[in-house]
């Protein structure tokens, strides 16, 4: 009873804090004022509070159930939001990249945790005895590595998606070109004295517009480079976790079912996801096809992760169907 109450309190604290954090963060994006910088810093600290709240929630379920809390979809989603909060804290202590990663991690934490605690999973939050297939020391190793891999790959893929949005975003037409055309017409209509004044004025305006356009394009270029930089490193880390998770799952499958690979639906989609991100990393080693091409591959990988993560759970088939929506 005590553990249930504590779990209920920690769930509401973590979800409430991250909701407030997301609200504050969106306000700072809509109202870019220096007076609310303190609120933005407080929102980052709120994610740290959320991290400890989710950590306490996982520990409470671990103690109460007697096993590592990764036996169903609800617990895996909570663990996934915990992984995103870790990435958020890394960006918090790295002040130079703070704003870039927080844009991805803060909404991800609240959406994932909100879905986990929603009515779709009303039967999942209750801890239950593990099925015989999950009563193994490989549970913590395999599932935790897979979820950490999913979290890192999703975060890195979202950064690549942001790169695509910024790259293909159409820049509004600059009005300094129109001024050049107007200058030509004015030169034909006015006297020399008036022309001298107009040319001087328009040359100043032209220089200001060029500087503005250059600074804006330079900032976009720097932002794209930083997104590409961090996307590659986070996806590389997630790829390592995913590889370890697949290998540990193969060893576990051999001990449980007598075969390293059974072409189970989730195994198949995990292998496809692994292949896509292997292609992404291969593209990043080729300087001639970096940037947009690798970001498109990451976008495909982002879709495949959700298919792999929820596909089997929605269908309720295969060896991994014990955590599905229909299993309860």
From Swiss-Prot:
Pfam families listed in its UniProt record: Cytochrom_C_asm
Give the keywords, sorted: Chloroplast, Cytochrome c-type biogenesis, Membrane, Plastid, Thylakoid, Transmembrane, Transmembrane helix
List the membrane topology term(s): Multi-pass membrane protein
Q: Where in the cell is it found?
A: Plastid, Chloroplast thylakoid membrane
MF terms (GO), sorted A to Z: heme binding
**Cellular component GO terms, alphabetically?**
chloroplast thylakoid membrane
The main location is plastid
Q: Per the UniProt record, which residue ranges are transmembrane?
A: 13-33, 46-66, 73-93, 101-121, 146-166, 234-254, 263-283, 295-315
Cleavable signal peptide: none
Described function: Required during biogenesis of c-type cytochromes (cytochrome c6 and cytochrome f) at the step of heme attachment.
PANTHER family assigned: CYTOCHROME B_B6 PROTEIN-RELATED, HEME EXPORTER PROTEIN C
The entry's family comment says: Belongs to the CcmF/CycK/Ccl1/NrfE/CcsA family.
**Protein name per Swiss-Prot or TrEMBL:** Cytochrome c biogenesis protein CcsA
Organism equals Arabidopsis thaliana (Mouse-ear cress)
């Amino acid at each position: 009873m005590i553990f249930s109450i504590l779990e209920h309190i920690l769930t509401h604290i973590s979800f409430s804090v991250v909701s407030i954090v997301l609200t504050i963060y969106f306000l700072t994006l809509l109202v870019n004022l220096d007076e609310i910088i303190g609120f933005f810093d407080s929102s980052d600290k709120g994610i740290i509070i959320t991290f400890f709240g989710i950590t306490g929630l996982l520990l409470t379920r671990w103690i109460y159930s007697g096993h590592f809390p990764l036996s169903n979809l609800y617990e895996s989603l909570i663990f996934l939001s915990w992984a995103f909060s870790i990435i958020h804290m890394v960006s918090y202590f790295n002040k130079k990249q703070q704003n870039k990663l927080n844009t991805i991690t803060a909404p991800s934490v609240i959406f994932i945790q909100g879905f986990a605690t929603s009515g779709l999973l009303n039967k999942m939050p209750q801890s239950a005895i593990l099925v015989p297939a999950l009563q193994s020391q490989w549970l913590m190793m395999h599932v935790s590595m897979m979820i950490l891999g999913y979290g890192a790959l999703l975060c890195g893929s979202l950064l690549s998606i942001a790169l695509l949005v910024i790259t293909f975003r159409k820049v509004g037409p600059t009005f300094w070109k129109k001024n050049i055309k107007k200058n030509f017409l004015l030169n034909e209509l006015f006297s020399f004295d008036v022309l001298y004044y107009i040319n001087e004025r328009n040359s100043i305006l032209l220089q200001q517009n060029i500087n503005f356009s250059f600074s804006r394009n330079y900032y976009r270029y720097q932002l794209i480079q930083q997104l590409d930089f961090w996307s590659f490193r986070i996806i590389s880390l997630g790829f390592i976790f995913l590889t370890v998770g697949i290998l540990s799952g193969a060893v576990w499958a051999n001990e449980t079912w007598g075969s390293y690979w059974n072409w189970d639906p989730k195994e198949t989609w995990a292998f496809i996801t692994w292949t896509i991100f292997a292609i992404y990393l291969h593209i990043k080693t080729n300087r001639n096809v970096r940037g947009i091409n690798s970001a498109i591959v990451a976008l495909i990988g982002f879709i495949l992760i959700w298919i792999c993560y929820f596909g089997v759970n929605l269908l309720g088939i295969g060896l991994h169907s014990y955590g599905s929506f229909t299993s309860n």
